[in-house]
């Protein structure tokens, strides 16, 4: 096939383009901005556009298909030309479905935990030597791409999210996959992440359940109230239903042990959310024919997905974790996980907030007491980003202090100041948790960890 990507530079889109080229398709693409690592990956694959920007002339009648990225607007000149010529236009999820019609489609959905559950299943299947394709939203250890598509693998694992498919299609992406096995980990409406109402948000998950193929299977978290609601509201669907819940566990000397029958299996991950994720991953693997012993032997050495409550470094009894999390509920959950795991250690938590998080008072208000379990709390706001949004820095700093309502809070707006703070902080007896909505606020987390863990004179008591 001759396939053209409109908005080829996205993290998932450029991986799909490279995968299709490797399968022998003729692939081209356009974008108005391409950054790393997409730029280098596309250049290495010989798929980097000859010019940056949109050009309707590249859309010709001999194209078999257009794959439209979310980044492209409805008035994109290449899109308009393709519509005029009647070329078949696919959104990303539509195309993935077309390529996986003859496979067992396993789709993992939920507000939180999708990437982690998919990566757990991938880890187990890989260790057991199973052949499978996958589509995941973040780079995972042991896998060199976000997408693997082949003609031979009998199974495809898909991280399915609830956001719209493209600029000309407001259906949720996960409505297109028609899973044989689906999992919903949780359903949590968050005004910081979506502009739709809570009812509309929950409805997307009900419609997702409706798309499960006849006699397919829904795996769901029995401990999530909203999951139970959407499952109950779709009781007429002719599918199998298999609920799961968090397993029993113990923590000893900073290591979590999961109870499996009479055995205590040590894990390399922490937090109740991850334990629930393991239960969900195991249930899916059961439906794929994996035996219990095989699963737990394989999962015991699973490490967190990259930047999802991920261990960074430890020294002299102190540990540093990082987490791709900035919404109020995830902030609270991740802090609780680290505090529970290391209950005898004090915790310093650093959260980066973006201008979007603080633009509206009602969104900021949702953070109230979200860091209450952390002994010290630091909110980082990049003052340059704040200025670009014409926000008065002093006003927003005052609001942050008032809203978070934390007795040991510091608000920092400058990178140099943040470096100095970490260098001066007495880390003995403390752990550190980095939390960010972006790429770790543009810094090297390992470097920050070194500054925090370095021996220094006591400044805090």
Regions found by a protein language model. Name each.
Residues 1-35, 42-49, 62-66, 82-87, ...:
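ATP-dependent carboxylate-amine ligase
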Residues 255-260:
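Short polybasic amphipathic segments
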Residues 265-270, 318-322:
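Short pre-catalytic strand/loop immediately N-terminal to key active-site residues, enriched for Gly-Thr
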């Amino acid at each position: 096939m001759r396939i053209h990507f409109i908005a080829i530079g996205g993290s998932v889109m450029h991986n799909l383009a490279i995968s299709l080229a490797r399968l022998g398709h003729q692939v081209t693409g356009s974008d108005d901005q391409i950054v790393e690592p997409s730029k280098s990956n596309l250049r290495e694959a010989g798929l980097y556009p000859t010019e940056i920007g949109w050009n309707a002339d590249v859309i010709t009648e001999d194209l078999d298909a257009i794959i439209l990225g979310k980044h492209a607007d409805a008035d994109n000149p290449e899109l308009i030309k393709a519509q005029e010529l009647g070329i078949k236009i696919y959104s990303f999820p539509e195309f993935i479905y077309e390529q996986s019609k003859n496979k067992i489609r396993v789709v993992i959905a939920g507000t939180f935990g999708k990437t982690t559950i998919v990566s757990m299943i991938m880890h187990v299947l890989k260790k057991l030597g199973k052949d499978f394709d996958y589509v995941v939203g973040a780079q995972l250890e042991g896998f060199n791409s976000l997408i693997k598509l082949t003609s031979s693998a009998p199974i495809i694992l898909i991280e399915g999210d609830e956001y719209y498919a493209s600029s000309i299609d407001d259906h949720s992406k996960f409505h297109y996959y028609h899973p044989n096995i689906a999992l919903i980990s949780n359903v949590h409406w968050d005004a910081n992440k979506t502009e739709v109402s809570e009812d509309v948000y929950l409805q997307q998950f009900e419609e997702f359940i409706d798309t499960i193929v006849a006699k397919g299977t829904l795996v769901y978290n029995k401990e999530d109230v909203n999951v139970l609601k959407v499952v109950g509201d779709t009781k007429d669907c002719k599918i199998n239903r298999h609920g799961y819940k968090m397993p029993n566990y113990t923590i000893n000397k900073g290591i979590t042990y999961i109870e499996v029958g009479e055995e205590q299996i040590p894990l390399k991950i922490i937090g109740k959310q991850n334990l629930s994720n393991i239960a969900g991953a195991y249930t899916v693997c059961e439906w794929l024919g994996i035996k219990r012993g095989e699963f737990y032997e394989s999962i015991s050495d699973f490490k967190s997905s990259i930047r999802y409550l991920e261990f960074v470094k430890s020294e002299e009894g102190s540990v540093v974790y990082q987490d791709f999390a900035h919404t109020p509920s995830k902030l609270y959950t991740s802090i609780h996980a680290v505090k529970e795991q290391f209950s005898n250690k004090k915790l310093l938590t650093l959260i980066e907030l973006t201008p979007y998080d603080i633009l509206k008072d009602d969104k900021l208000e949702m953070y109230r007491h979200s860091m209450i379990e952390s002994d010290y709390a630091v909110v980082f706001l990049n003052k340059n980003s704040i200025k670009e949004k014409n926000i008065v820095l002093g006003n927003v700093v005052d609001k942050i202090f008032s809203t978070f309502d934390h007795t040991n809070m510091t608000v920092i707006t400058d990178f140099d100041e943040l470096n100095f703070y970490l260098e001066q902080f007495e880390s003995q007896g403390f752990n550190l948790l980095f939390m960010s909505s972006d790429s770790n606020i543009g810094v090297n987390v390992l470097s920050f960890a070194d500054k925090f863990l370095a021996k220094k004179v006591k400044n805090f008591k």
